A protein has these predicted regions:
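Flexible, glycine- and charge-enriched loops at secondary-structure boundaries
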Residues: 115-119, 181, 230, 287, ...
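Glycine-/proline-rich flexible loop or hinge segments
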Residues: 99-114
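Hydrophobic beta-strand segments of well-ordered beta-sheets in folded domains
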Residues: 100-102, 134-142, 307-309
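Aromatic (often tryptophan-rich) hydrophobic motifs at membrane interfaces
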Residues: 103, 123-128, 238-353
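A conserved beta-strand-loop-helix scaffold within acyl/acetyltransferase catalytic domains
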Residues: 24, 28-82, 86-98, 144-163, ...
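Non-catalytic accessory segments adjacent to catalytic cores
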Residues: 116-167
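Cationic, low-complexity basic patches in intrinsically disordered or flexible, solvent-exposed regions
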Residues: 4
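Active-site/acyl-donor-binding loops of N-acyltransferases
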Residues: 7-34, 38, 145, 150-175, ...
Length: 374
């Protein structure tokens, strides 16, 4: 639905105003290639990307969230060929075990041909920039399509290089279901019916109070205990909602008798949406709460004009641990979508090797303690 003119003005007023670079860095290049790397501000990066797919983590809006979490913007850069943008990247300063690294989530954003040679050259230029600007940075975490000798598996967290995206272009639930696999069509219709008969309600609760959000968060504790992972503190999710704002972050909640049983935190950028976080209670399985909620979210976003809902991650030969969740997600799309996975790019190979060795030792000790407890 169309928004009031005042809302449009408010959106524009809320956009972060990145400061202009008063002392711009020199343009970085190598003698063997024509592409160059240049530091830019948020406005110039946004103009360069234009109408191309722009992951929310690379937008100016994301800077608000990272700043609120104590992870400042390290820099935005344009990779260009004869003055024409080829790729854009925003990097944030992170700390892990007392060591500093840079994280470009879902970056770089490629605007022209993404060849193995260009990927490698961009990384070479970035390493050079880091060595000049900040000797405390140990590695860069960024995405790449092609395996290469300078890439390492992640020291922490997991990535994904395959995902499923619900096609929202058909807009109506009937047409959206028609382009899904047969078992997916049956599943969403059944989930919709079972949840309705159980008396469930689903709504957009993006503007809820902190007190109410804390109650919704408790569903994630139950999910984590069931599925064996450690969730972030509630403050992380709340900060994401409030710092990104309704234009880029939404919270959809399924309730039964007023009690929250499932929720999706969905991020948006342009015409694209991503199911960033989600949770469901054990009881919700009896009335297919998570399935009903995911389908409702997809239908709602389709009506608002979004073109896809990325379910974020599916199993692959590189990340087999995502196989099970991928089996659930595959019902929503006819085909898997290949995406660039994240990699670590050592700036100092010696120090990074030491960090890797220390992690292997910690993992081995943890496994040994676990086996003794068993």
């Amino acid at each position: 639905p169309a928004q009031p003119a005042m809302a449009d003005k408010a959106d524009k007023a809320d956009k972060p105003k990145a400061p202009r670079l008063t002392h711009p860095e020199p343009v970085h290049s190598t003698p063997d290639r024509s592409e160059t790397l240049r530091r830019v501000d948020g406005r110039e990066m946004r103009l360069a990307v234009g109408n191309s797919h722009f992951p929310v983590e690379q937008t100016e809006a994301w800077e608000r969230f990272e700043e609120a979490m104590g992870r400042p913007l390290w820099g935005r850069y344009l990779y260009e060929d004869e003055g024409k943008p080829v790729a854009a990247i925003a990097l944030y300063r992170y700390e892990m075990g007392g060591q500093t690294f840079l994280w470009a989530k879902h970056g770089p954003v490629w605007l022209k041909e993404q060849s193995p040679e260009r990927e490698a050259h961009l990384r070479r230029l970035l390493r050079s920039v880091v060595k000049e600007r900040d000797r405390s940075v140990r590695f860069i975490r960024m995405h790449a399509r092609y395996r290469a000798a300078d890439l390492r598996e992640l020291l922490s967290t997991i990535t994904y290089d395959r995902t499923y995206v619900i096609d929202l272009v058909p807009k109506t639930p009937e047409k959206m279901a028609a382009v899904m696999p047969k078992d997916g069509r049956r599943a969403v219709k059944r989930a919709e019916r079972v949840a309705r008969e159980a008396g469930c309600t689903i709504s957009d609760e993006t503007g809820l109070s902190r007190e109410e959000f804390d109650k919704v968060y408790e569903v994630l504790r139950e999910t984590a205990e069931r599925d064996g992972f450690k969730p972030h503190d509630a403050e992380v999710y709340w900060t994401m909602l409030t710092s990104l704002g309704e234009k880029n972050a939404r919270l959809f909640v399924l309730r039964k008798d007023g009690v929250p049983h499932a929720w999706d935190l969905i991020l948006t950028s342009g015409k694209d949406s991503v199911a960033y976080y989600g949770a469901s209670s054990n009881e919700s399985r009896t009335f297919r709460g998570a399935e009903a909620l995911d389908w409702w979210a997809a239908c709602t976003l389709a009506q608002e004009g979004y073109r896809g809902l990325d379910l974020m991650g599916a199993g692959s030969t590189r990340v087999p641990s995502l196989y099970t969740v991928g089996q659930y997600k595959k019902r929503y799309a006819q085909h898997v979508t290949e995406v660039d996975g994240a990699w670590d790019v050592p700036v100092s190979r010696v120090i990074y090797s030491g960090m890797s060795a220390a992690k292997r030792l910690r993992d081995a000790l943890r496994a040994r303690r676990g086996s003794r407890e068993d």
